[in-house]
């Protein structure tokens, strides 16, 4: 049993390519550090692809499964994107902290669903609107069902994200979010128990939630707490005079080096926070100019100014 996926099918791998590496951030617990890159055009990372991917999934990020079903039954699926953007604009400006309008908050939603198969309970925009009274510290909350393999178990995955120029700064700032989530873990779980059933309509989804997340009185919930982290950062200057294919090879080599240089640092941060007993799932994506582009992308999305 597992929850239904919400990220739009057949979009992720059209835009993101994963880099293979052998580094580990966890010796004893499940966990991973996965690095991805976008396509390159005319010597630069193709940010337009990130805008398009974000826009194609915006309704699924903003609305619960139950709300999307209401639109579908009413024959109004064609207005979901428009209504999602309307809600985001009412929440605040592009890239405004804590509103659900940050690029990293959307990326952690997408990466956890697509690559971890930890499906959405509440995204950041839902946490900041429908569940605002609970003051969640998370950038999204997902649920990963056991697949029955050795060492696999049900996990409630709390999301954190940061996009900033230096990768080490992004790591540090993401762990500040994680520490806040950990300190309020009981409150976060209480919020899920009080709100999550209203966000689903599918009987199979509800069966999963009632079995593992919000069990009947007298039964215990069946999951561990884990963390999913999205980090965006500056790639650096791509060398001139190279073809785009050559630049993609250079990017792969650089990302392998990034993995080697920062895996041990992430592992130590986990230990410093006293969270060694939790699984961590990191997703890293370089940009040309992270600080500028995260704002530009979200401004284009909120304005509806994205070519699809």
Please give the residue ranges for each predicted region.
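A short, highly charged nucleic-acid-interacting micro-segment common to nuclease
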Residues: 85-109
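Extended, Lys/Arg-enriched charged tracts that mediate electrostatic binding to polyanionic substrates
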Residues: 103-135
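Short acidic, S/G/P-rich loop/turn micro-motifs used as interaction or catalytic elements
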Residues: 43-44, 164-166, 235-239, 290
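Short amphipathic alpha-helical segments
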Residues: 46, 50, 76, 99-108, ...
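Acidic, metal/cofactor-coordinating or nucleic-acid-engaging core segments within structured domains
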Residues: 171-263
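Extended, charged low-complexity segments
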Residues: 242-308
């Amino acid at each position: 049993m597992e929850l239904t996926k919400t990220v739009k099918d057949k979009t992720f791998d059209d835009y993101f390519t994963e880099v293979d590496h052998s580094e580990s951030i966890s010796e004893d617990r499940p966990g991973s550090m996965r690095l991805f890159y976008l396509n390159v055009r005319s010597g630069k990372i193709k940010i337009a692809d990130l805008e398009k991917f974000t826009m194609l999934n915006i309704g699924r990020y903003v609305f619960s499964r139950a709300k999307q079903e209401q639109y579908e039954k009413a024959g109004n699926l064609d207005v979901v994107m428009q209504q999602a953007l309307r809600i985001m604009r009412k929440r605040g400006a592009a890239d405004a902290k804590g509103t659900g309008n940050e690029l990293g908050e959307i990326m952690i939603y997408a990466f956890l669903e697509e690559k971890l198969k930890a499906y959405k309970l509440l995204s950041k925009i839902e946490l900041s609107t429908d569940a605002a009274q609970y003051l969640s510290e998370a950038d999204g909350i997902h649920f990963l069902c056991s697949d029955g393999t050795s060492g696999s178990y049900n996990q409630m995955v709390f999301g954190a994200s940061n996009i900033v120029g230096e990768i080490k700064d992004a790591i540090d700032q993401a762990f500040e979010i994680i520490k806040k989530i950990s300190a309020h873990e009981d409150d976060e779980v209480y919020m899920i128990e009080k709100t999550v059933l209203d966000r689903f309509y599918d009987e199979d989804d509800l069966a999963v939630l009632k079995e593992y997340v919000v069990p009947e009185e007298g039964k215990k919930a069946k999951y561990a707490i884990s963390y999913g982290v999205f980090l965006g950062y500056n790639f650096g200057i791509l060398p001139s005079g190279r073809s785009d294919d050559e630049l993609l090879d250079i990017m792969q080599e650089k990302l392998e080096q990034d993995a080697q240089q920062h895996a041990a640092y992430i592992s130590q941060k986990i230990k410093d926070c006293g969270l060694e007993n939790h699984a961590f799932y990191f997703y890293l994506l370089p940009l040309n100019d992270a600080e500028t582009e995260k704002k530009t992308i979200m401004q284009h999305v909120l304005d509806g100014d994205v070519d699809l």
